[in-house]
Amino acid sequence: MNHIIIHDRAGLNQFYAKVYAFVGLGIGLSALVSGLMLTVFQSQLVYLLMQGRLWLTIATFAELALVFVASSMASRNSPAALPVFLLYSVLNGFTLSFVVAFYTPGTVLSAFVSSALLFFVMAAVGIFTKKDLSGIGRAMMAALIGLLIAMVVNIFLASGFFDYMISVAMVLVFSGLIAWDNQKIRLAYEQSQGRVATGWVVSMALSIYLDFINLFLSILRIFGRND
């Protein structure tokens, strides 16, 4: 029995490592593209910013389309799921540069470090807790929908305080989702007895990637209120 437990634990650790390899690759690509836009292609970025929100709007809609395509391909275990996820990561790095450009490097670094620390804590909660987090996960998803509606409303209100409260709530929501999504990785492994299709690995990596990026953006808005 001990040998079986050790084997299962080793297999689960390898499975987490595989998921997080994809997550790390996605975040790395986004950071690389965003960094290049802010340095090597800074003049082009300034030009695009001066053109208004057209390019950002186009890129945002393209991102949404890629998320749906990647999720659909992952659910069908399509070999194209991983390339689409990586393409999304590249495009997201492009759009992130539009946001990050308005903050100081110190603020961006502080937000990233804080996001990483909070992410690792909540990921550990999801990985090691024995409590079923599905109820919390569903509540966080419902709260996220409400916050997205609030963000749309605040486009017209243009309230700085309202935006701050939304950002704080977003941090709480994505912290909960990070724990839940990490628990789902373990459950997927256990329920499939370690035979999880690559498409599902990509799907879980996409969820974790989105959790981290949105957590970072929420903390960045909080830290950068005075920038």
Where do the language-model regions lie?
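A hydrophobic alpha-helical transmembrane-helix feature that marks the membrane cores
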Residues: M1-D227
